[in-house]
Amino acid sequence: MSFIDRNDGGENSIDVDTLRTMIDLYSKNFVEVSSDVEIKTNNIVDKLFAYFKKHNITVINAGIIANNSELIDEDLLDLGTINNGILSLNIQPVTITVDLKSGILNSVKYHQSKLINILLDKNIDPIKIEPKIHLLLSTYKQYEPLVRLVRMKSQVNDFDFVYPLAAHGELDIIKLVMHYYQLQDEIIGKICVQAIMNGRVNIVEHFLTSEAFRSAPDLMYGFFIRGIEHGGHINITKYFIDKGLCIQQNDYEPVKVAAMTKRRDILKYFYELDNSIVNIIIDNV
């Protein structure tokens, strides 16, 4: 008999008491030697059924283990075999099969990073199970296992995971990524865009230095306008002004964009810089 614990719609379910009875009967009648494997198996069984009892679970349905990733521990990984991201474990007379990809997703989503660390401790590459694990970790702000992966210089299939880091203002982790990996200029540019859109002035200050304003003034002006239009963060706007950009550029385009997008804090700041813009504001609101 197989008990398939996956999220693909094809799983069976079983009554908890029935499953416990089956396992106990098999152990009593067919298991003669109390080996290390048998001891670990019994520990797994005891932990699973203790969890079911604690949470008043009477029927084991699809995904019960994958959806509760704390159940995937060292013993389960030691005794099971992994093939194409699926963990299979024989607990006679049943075989439990767990979708580790779903387990990783739920582990990250619900801030239970223990599973990722266990996989790494067991030299099991989580990237082979979930190729987007870096992005998952950065999106859900699970930085401890992410930093561990970066320090290991783990395989990275796509550096899009740095963009949530920029949006969240995690400059130190971005710098760590750049220490271990070579990021293309295009990626750096997108990091800056995310920082500008989300008001992360610490990241803007790090990448858009005085030298950047001297060597690429048109690009800096583009960032300035985009920041007003799509971000609207006053701290970002002030940074660009402090670096030498002015509101009179391109026939007062910064003022017009701020007026059209109703950036009141920015307009107030611009008015403090130049109170002659009042008519421009009126014409563009």
Swiss-Prot record:
ANK repeats lie at residues 99-129, 157-186, 188-214, 215-249. It comes from the Viruses. Keywords: ANK repeat, Repeat. InterPro entries: Ankyrin_rpt-contain_sf. This is Putative ankyrin repeat protein R551. It comes from Acanthamoeba polyphaga mimivirus.
